[in-house]
Curated annotation (Swiss-Prot):
Functions at a post-ubiquitation step in the ubiquitin fusion degradation (UFD) pathway. It is required for vegetative growth. GO terms for molecular function: polyubiquitin modification-dependent protein binding; SUMO binding. The keyword Protein transport does not apply. Gene3D superfamilies: 3.10.330.10, Ubiquitin fusion degradation protein UFD1, N-terminal domain. This is Ubiquitin fusion degradation protein 1. One of its GO terms (biological process) is ribosome-associated ubiquitin-dependent protein catabolic process. Residues 303-342 are annotated as: Disordered. It holds the Pfam family UFD1_N2. PANTHER family: UBIQUITIN FUSION DEGRADATON PROTEIN 1, UBIQUITIN RECOGNITION FACTOR IN ER-ASSOCIATED DEGRADATION PROTEIN 1. The gene is ufd1. It comes from the Eukaryota.
Length: 342
């Protein structure tokens, strides 16, 4: 009953459990660490995909998905991207697994950050990154201020990103214009200075865009120049007119008989004064100004007028001699109608 076969079977069971435990332990400790030849997403066969180029996710080959599945890497899959030759590093996610074997396609801004050229080697390592709660960004151009709703534009753009790394300058596309934005600060912060922006509530703050102070100074100078006056003031037109008027008709006159012309007082034809803007006309509500004082006619003056005063007075004229009737015809009136013979 308790022969050697029983103990042999028990030993096999312990051996199998030990192997499973060892395999699980190895998978937990292992990580995805592979090197690929990198290329910009613009070189992906097929139609252009702006959401890939202006985002923070890469495209890996199908073999990467198989290996990540064996390692039980949890979602979201986040990675370190490292250029070992230049000792530069950034972070991001993965969008699809459709690249050719041995290749990885990166957004152009990510290749610029890592100082990579097409065909260079890049190291890809899976990692865990804490979810972010706060980021501070700085647009790299004052053109970003032309966007009316920054929050909506940025919220839509960050859907194409998985992480944000401090000091990175990423790119977004809006209304066919590319905007560069630098990550100034992230919270929570660690030694890697990176946060995850996947399924998290993120507070976003902005620093003034680069060139904003110069733009304000330029606008201020333009406003000061406008207050000082127009081109007439700038060229000193008033002084030029006075000088020209004083230099007119210089010399002495001579009569035909040789006598000198008596000096006459000079007449200043132009008296140019500095033109200033008229003071604003401030009137009470409901009051109108017609440019001159208005005097309403009095009622007494209208009553003094003679109501029987004839405005038109004269005598009628007939085209032929009319029949004489008894009585005297009144002035300006006729008892007989005007007859016209056919």
């Amino acid at each position: 009953m308790f022969g050697g076969s029983f103990f042999s079977s028990d030993d096999d069971g312990f051996s199998m459990m030990s192997q499973l435990r060892s395999a699980f332990h190895n998978n937990v400790n292992q990580r995805f660490d592979t090197r690929y030849r990198c290329y910009p997403v613009a070189m992906i066969p097929g139609e252009e995909r702006p959401n890939v180029n202006y985002g923070g996710k890469v495209i890996l080959p199908p073999s990467a998905l198989e290996k990540l599945s064996r390692l039980n890497v949890s979602y979201p899959m986040l990675f370190d991207f490292e250029n070992e030759a230049a000792e530069k590093k950034t972070h991001g996610g993965v969008l699809e697994f459709i690249a050719e074997e041995g290749r990885v396609y990166l957004p152009y801004w990510m290749m610029t950050t890592l100082s990579l050229e097409p065909g260079d080697l890049v190291r890809v390592i899976n990692t865990d990154i804490a979810q972010g709660s706060y980021v501070k960004l700085q647009p790299q151009s004052v053109n970003f201020l032309d966007i009316t709703d920054h929050r909506a534009v940025l919220e839509n753009a960050l859907r194409n990103f998985s992480t944000l790394t401090k000091s990175d300058i990423f790119e977004i596309l809006y209304n066919d214009q590319v905007y560069q934005i630098k990550v100034i600060d992230v919270q929570p912060d660690d030694s890697r200075h990176v946060v995850s922006v996947v399924e998290t509530d993120l507070v976003v703050d902005f620093d003034p865009p680069i060139g904003y102070e110069e733009s304000l100074q330029k606008n201020k100078q333009q406003n000061i120049a406008g207050v000082q006056g127009t081109m007439v003031t700038k060229i000193g037109y008033d002084e030029l007119v006075r000088q020209g008027d004083s230099n007119l008709m210089k010399g002495t006159g001579t009569k035909l008989n040789g006598k000198e012309v008596a000096e006459v007082p000079k007449i200043n034809l132009l008296d140019v004064e500095k033109q200033e803007c008229p003071a604003p006309l401030i009137l009470p509500l409901g009051t109108y100004f017609f440019g001159y004082p208005y005097k309403a006619p009095s009622i007494e003056e209208d009553s003094k007028k003679d109501p029987n005063l004839f405005k038109f007075e004269g005598a009628g004229t007939s085209l032929r001699a009319s029949r004489k009737t008894n009585g005297t015809m009144g002035k300006g009136s006729s008892d007989d109608p005007i007859d016209i013979d056919a």
